[in-house]
Structures are given as C-alpha cells and as structure tokens.
Amino acid sequence: SARRYQTYVTGREGEVWVQNGVRFDGMRDGVLLEAKDHYSQFIDVNTGEFYDWFGGQSSLLDEASRQIAASEGALIEWHFSEERTLHAFEQLFSSQNIEGISLVFDPIK
C-alpha cells in the first residue's frame, strides 16, 4: 500500500513534514522525502510515458514546483517503488524542465 511504502521511505509511520507551508512525506538526515507508489497503472507499457487519459500530470508538476520553491536549498528526493514509474517521471520532469529533485528507484526490500 502507499502508506506502507511511505513508512518504508521515511522511516516514520503516518507522519508528514511541512516546510514553508508545503507538505512532504517526510524528512531524514536533512533530505526532504516524497514516496511514490503504484503509478505504473497510469503508464503505457509500450511508450513508458503516462497515458494521455491520466489527468494527474499537472498536479504532480505543481507539487514538484511547490516543493522546490519551499525547500530553501535542502535536497529533495522522490522515491519510487517501480522502475517503470521512475522513468516516466524522469521523462515528465525533463519535458517540463523540472530540476532540483533527485529521483530514486527504491523498491521495498
């Protein structure tokens, strides 16, 4: 579940971190964390990109922009449970010139 993955990434169950009014899933060792789980259902296996019908791209880009602005230079990592999802986010961020967030493939071990 998404909650289980968030706990895995952040090391804390059910907590969030708010920095300058912007929500992150957590913070560990000075790094702002976001856990992304189960997005592969929105990704076309043939193209590796989000399906056209997936309406969440703009909100994800908005979330990224708000987090970068709120970070005050702190490192931001978005962790992904699925490698396919990581690649789709790399393409999405690159296409919109989103920089300042490290994308990490981090399956539950």
What residue ranges belong to the model's regions?
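Catalytic toxin/effector domains delivered as secreted proteins or via bacterial secretion systems
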Residues: 1-109
